[in-house]
Amino acid sequence: MKTKAAVLFETHKPFEIVELEL
């Protein structure tokens, strides 16, 4: 079972990548 932080990281990863590219 993944930790809550790991799940949130994977869930928001695409959004964070977009923010870093901006």
From Swiss-Prot:
Keywords linked to the UniProt accession: Cytoplasm, NAD, Oxidoreductase
Protein location: Cytoplasm
EC number(s) per entry: 1.1.99.36
Domain of life: Bacteria
Cofactor section: NADH
Example of a GO cellular component annotation carried by this entry: cytoplasm
Catalytic activity: N,N-dimethyl-4-nitrosoaniline + a primary alcohol = 4-(hydroxylamino)-N,N-dimethylaniline + an aldehyde; ethanol + A = acetaldehyde + AH2
Gene Ontology MF terms: oxidoreductase activity
pH profile: Optimum pH is 7.0.
Family as reported in the entry's similarity comment: Belongs to the zinc-containing alcohol dehydrogenase family.
Assembly with partners or alone: Homotetramer.
Cited function: This is a novel enzyme, catalytically different from common alcohol dehydrogenases. It is effective in oxidizing ethanol, other primary alcohols and benzylalcohol only in the presence of p-nitroso-N,N-dimethylaniline (NDMA) as an electron acceptor. NADH acts as a cofactor here instead of as a coenzyme.
Protein name: NDMA-dependent alcohol dehydrogenase
Organism for this UniProt entry: Rhodococcus erythropolis
Native organism taxonomy: Bacteria, Bacillati, Actinomycetota, Actinomycetes, Mycobacteriales
